Every structure is written in C-alpha cells, then in structure tokens.
Amino acid sequence: MKRVLIPGVILCGADVAQAVDDKNMYMHFFEEMTVYAPVPVPVNGNTHYTSESIERLPTGNGNISDLLRTNPAVRMDSTQSTSLNQGDIRPEKISIHGASPYQNAYLIDGISATNNLNPANESDASSATNISGMSQGYYLDVSLLDNVTLYDSFVPVEFGRFNGGVIDAKIKRFNADDSKVKLGYRTTRSDWLTSHIDENNKSAFNQGSSGSTYYSPDFKKNFYTLSFNQELADNFGVTAGLSRRQSDITRADYVSNDGIVAGRAQYKNVIDTALSKFTWFASDRFTHDLTLKYTGSSRDYNTSTFPQSDREMGNKSYGLAWDMDTQLAWAKLRTTVGWDHISDYTRHDHDIWYTELSCTYGDITGRCTRGGLGHISQAVDNYTFKTRLDWQKFAVGNVSHQPYFGAEYIYSDAWTERHNQSESYVINAAGKKTNHTIYHKGKGRLGIDNYTLYMADRISWRNVSLMPGVRYDYDNYLSNHNISPRFMTEWDIFANQTSMITAGYNRYYGGNILDMGLRDIRNSWTESVSGNKTLTRYQDLKTPYNDELAMGLQQKIGKNVIARANYVYREAHDQISKSSRTDSATKTTITEYNNDGKTKTHSFSLSFELAEPLHIRQVDINPQIVFSYIKSKGNLSLNNGYEESNTGDNQVVYNGNLVSYDSVPVADFNNPLKISLNMDFTHQPSGLVWANTLAWQEARKARIILGKTNAQYISEYSDYKQYVDEKLDSSLTWDTRLSWTPQFLQQQNLTISADILNVLDSKTAVDTTNTGVATYASGRTFWLDVSMKF
C-alpha cells in the first residue's frame, strides 16, 4: 500500500491531492516522503486512514473503533468484545494515551459529532432515570468514508474539548473520475466462529444472558452498502452512501429461578447509516459543500429472568452542514455552519415494574419481577458556526511566518423527556405495595453557549519549524475560562528528510457531560411514597484537562527503511468523579461530582517500514513491525469515568500492601506491551492481495475486588478497600485478509474478500472474577465480503 508521509500527516494513493489541501490548513510540513506500509501508524501524532487503508484492514463490524484497533496510541477494553457477545455490533470504547474513552472528540468534516449526553454509561440494564449512551454521536460505517484522521498527540490548536484524542471523519466528495456506483455485502454468523467459554458460564451463555449482561450464542450478521458518485452539472456533483448493518441474535425469552427456559426469541441489533455531500466548484476562488448525515441504531433486549421486560434501546443522530472555502488574494477563509441532533432513548413495552412473591409465566410459577419502566429519552441539538483565516506565507528577514486565526460558537439545546408515567414497587406477602416509586411524565432542557478563539503561527527558519499556538474556551455550563497553550517544533537535522526530531508541550481541556444537569431535571419528576429524594450537584466543577509532553523521531536507515519512535507523557488533572451521601433529616440522597480524579501515563511506540516495497517476481511485499507500550497509574476507572466513586480513597490495599490509591496501575484498558508484524503480498496481474497481522500481547493483569470470604483478604485492613491482581497469560494472534479483484472483469470491478480473525484459534483470557471464572477473547472467526463497482 502506497502512502505519502509528511511530518504531521500520513497521506495515501489517489487521495493525496485532496488530503494535502485539507492538511495544509492544520500544520506546517517539509518535503514529501513516499513510503509503503500495510497499516497506518502515527507520524508526529497524526494517523491518516484513507479509503484504501480502510479496505485493506479487517474492520470487523465496520465501526471507527474497529478501524483504530491496531493503532499504537489506542487501547481497547478487552472485556467489551469477547467470546460471549460476538453478536453485538455497537462501536467499542477506545482509550487514547490512557485517557477515559468518554473524553475523545469525534468530528465529521470538522464539526463536532461527540455525544456528551451520558457517554460513560453503556449499560443495557433497565433504568427509570439513567439513559445509556456512548461518546460516538454517529455510529458511522467506515466503508462509506473518504478518510479518517486520528490526532493522538501534538493536536493542533483548532481542536478542543477532549482529553484523549481527536477522530475526524471525512465524507467522500464528488470526483468525476470515480466509479458511479458501488454495492457491497458482508456477513458472518455464530456457526463461523469458535467461542471459548468458561464451564461456569456455559449455561448463561447458551441461554443468551445473565441478568442484564447479554450474550450471543446464536447470531447472524448481514451488512449491506450502496454508494454512488454523480456529476449533476459542470463543476457540480453529489456523493451518497447508504448502509444497513444488522445482527439477529436468538436468546432465551424467559428463564425461571430454577433455570427452566420457557421459549426463545430473536432480538435485532441494527445500525443504519446515510451520508451525502453536494459539492459545487463555483470558481477558482469559491468551493461549497453541503453535507447531510444520519445514523440510527436500535437494540432489542429483555431481562431473561424478568417476564414482560422487553425493551428497545438506541441512538438517533442526524444533521447538515454547509462549508464554504474562499481563496482571497492574501489568505484563505473557511466558513462552516452546521446543525446536529444527537439522541439516546430507552423504550420499554410496559410502564409498571414490580416484584411479587407469586407470579405465573406460561407453565412456570414462583417469585418474579416483571414489567418495564416506560419510555425515556434525552437529546441535544448543536448549532455550530465556525470560521478560520489562514494567511499566506510571508517572510521577515530569513524567517517565514504563516499565521492563522479561528473562532467557533456552538449553542447546545439539551433536553430530557419522560414520555409517559411509570411506576415501580414490590408486592409483599400481605399483597400490599412497598418501595413504591412514581416516575412522572415530564420534559426539561438546558441551553448552553460554547465560545472558542484560537490562533497559531507556523514559523520556519532554515531546517527548523516552530508552531506556537493558544486556544481559549468558555461555556456557561460550568462557567470556566480555559486557556490551552499548544507548542510544537520540528527539526530536519540534515535538511534532507533522513533524520527528523519533533517535540512539544500541549494542554487539552475536556468536554462537558450534560447528563449531570439533565439527571437533576429527571430526578425532579421522581416521587417516592416514602418521601425519599435525590439531588445532583455539579455546578462548581473545574474542567478536566491533560498536560502533554511529547517527542517524535524519524530516521531513514539505508536506502529503504524508515524508523519512527514516539514518546508521549500525559498527566490528567481535575478528572471528574462523584461521591454520595444521605441527609437523614430530609431523606435526601445527594450526589456530588468532584475533581478528585488523576492519572499519569507513559506511552511509547516504535515502527519500521519500507520506503519502497520488495519486488520478488511479480509480487510486491510490504513488511512492517510496530512496538507499542502504554502504562497508566491513577485513582480513576477509565470505564466508569465521571461515575467513578472511589477517588476519595487516599489509601487502599493492593496486592497485600497498603498504598496510596493514585499509585495503583489503572486496571481497565490495561494492555501495556503489544508487538505486531504486518505483511502484505500483492500480485497485480491476478488482482490478489493477501494482508496479514501477527500480534503478540504481553501477559497482563486482571483487577479483582476482594471480599471478606476471599483467601487473600487481610482482616487487619478491613477499613480499606482491597484489590489483588491476577495474571493473565500472554497471547499470540494472527489475522488475515485475502482479496481478489479479477482483472478480466474491468467494467464491473468485482472484489471478493475473506477475513479470518485469530487464525490460530488462540484461547486468550481477558478477565477473571474473584471466584476464578474466566472470560475469553473470541476464537477463530470468518467473514465474507463481496463488492462491485460500476
């Protein structure tokens, strides 16, 4: 795979012209360098995935998370996608350089697509007050995208409201030279994979659930895509892409207390995507883009031990944006106006949730909980205006300057709604209601103004380039004035691109979590017959931020090998967590959010790849080796994020020792050392491409919370929370993808691809419990992919 490497950016193949035009707006760079490598890796904190890269990589469910899985700056939650739940198609959470997954910024064509409603809560459990969400506002199908850029360090000043990284997805723009129509079909099913299940989990796995944890013993995935590219008039055209990704999962309909299964039912998991962009090249000076976007996801669930608990949970996002580029005599002006609607919802089939000592479901009788909690939703409408002015380069003596300035205003209209009244209670032995709570119908909203100003300058002298910048953010949600310094320097040591050093310091302020305010609104609709109340306090919070020190090295070895090393050190400050207390006098439970969370992360990566592929007969061979290491310590669960309630603990017992809590290694996303060998073989005459990734992951540790019944529990430390780590073995996996584009079908351009993930069928434990029950990664998995271009 051909890529053009530029300090600060990676470009690829036919996309170079447009990508270079976009990237010129962000960062100074030296002369281009062309390399060949199977998998994009960071160059000075930027990784650029073109449509060619996306087609090469086995992208699983087709989400952005799947695309970024192999990036050395990224770590996945290894417990989220396992042998137990391969039928799920939702995007997985990602952590970038040790930051919480909910603190990443997602953009579509430069406009925020981040869901900041309740991104740390991905629970599928029934709840009357808490709505599931995730940080990706749009569940994009990457096969419909033109390119995706990950900014993991040295992030330019125009990007903000994140602690981890920025993921900017670009929708395809009209190109008269592209194919008119592309059709695609992709599939897998439970019969095509090997599941590794602990003996203690087999019964629950075969039933399809355990309480509110959902498994996929029997599923079929079918993905359909359609995209087209059409010229409508001179210098005016449109692109559009449609996709449906569907997983049909068969689970137990109801399981009694003694394990009797009463029927099975099929539950759908669906993600729809629709993207379109109209482009008008009005003149040499003016270009207009009108973008329309939509994704909708829905998931059907029931709690198998609760009759009549069926519910639908999902997300719907849609929006439009108008972008105008104006080339002035002395500068380039870009103006963007956009609107995005992002919503999450839970819709139960029933409005009453109750427990009774004696109930009947089919032929089964006994104590049970049944019903549902009505329909509840929350949403935000973001109205965006942003502009940026890039001055043309000018010189002062021997020093050249290229400053740019920008401003952004976003009005966020956030609201939450309970669409009908619901109730929950327990029927006691006397047949009377106890623990009775009424959730009243209601709707409430928050209006938030977000302001941003930024400026930076590209300063070059001989073979040294500097980029100082500063960003200012303010919003009236937390009412904090945040100033983010950004600085990067590049040094081309011999002025010939063979040896380059990049270094910098940057600060990144995070985004707001709207659910803290919306939850307080929902709590006001809750009436407890006993008089209990709930309050949420968040108004005095500081904005969480990360300080970053980073360095990158790039060295050409001989005539054909490129080596790159990157080091990133992050300190996370003022991370949000919570504490709860009860005022017995007023019967009020008060949840107070605080800034007690903190982490420190060391991240290092090293890669070797070729400037030119190896040619053996008619086969091009592209090898690549990537090492990455990420280690974090802190007092915050990355998964729980702002819902973490342990950060107030100054000391804990860890592996038998009383230690400071913030010195304990972070437990989740804990995959420190990874080494991968990527190898592509391309035979142009036959149209065959064979892509391979052999990945080794060092032994890692699973965190276990000890109870008094555990043998490792130390009674003299009973006043402290106690944790112990259990070692999980190292793993070796081999993923392969074979694609064939028959050269004798030039008009149709048919491509048939087969993915085999975990070819070796390695049995890798990813988690364990305090009773020794292990959870394993997925075994060998087959995917089939067919596409045709006209």
Curated annotation (Swiss-Prot):
Domain TBDR plug, which positions?
37-172
Entry GO CC = cell outer membrane
**Any idea where this protein resides?**
Cell outer membrane
Q: What membrane topology is annotated for this entry?
A: Multi-pass membrane protein
Query: Is Transport tagged as a keyword?
Result: yes
Q: What is its main location?
A: membrane
Keywords from the UniProt entry: Cell outer membrane, Membrane, Transmembrane, Transmembrane beta strand, Transport
Q: Does the keyword Metal-binding apply?
A: no
Q: Please name the Pfam families in this protein's record.
A: Plug
Q: Where is the TBDR beta-barrel domain?
A: 178-790
Q: Cross-referenced InterPro entries, in alphabetical order?
A: Plug_dom, Plug_dom_sf, TonB-dep_rcpt-like, TonB_rcpt_b-brl_sf
Q: List the disulfide bonds in this chain.
A: none
Which PROSITE patterns does its entry note?
Answer: TONB_DEPENDENT_REC_3
Into which family does the record put it?
A: Belongs to the TonB-dependent receptor family.
Protein known as = Uncharacterized protein YddB
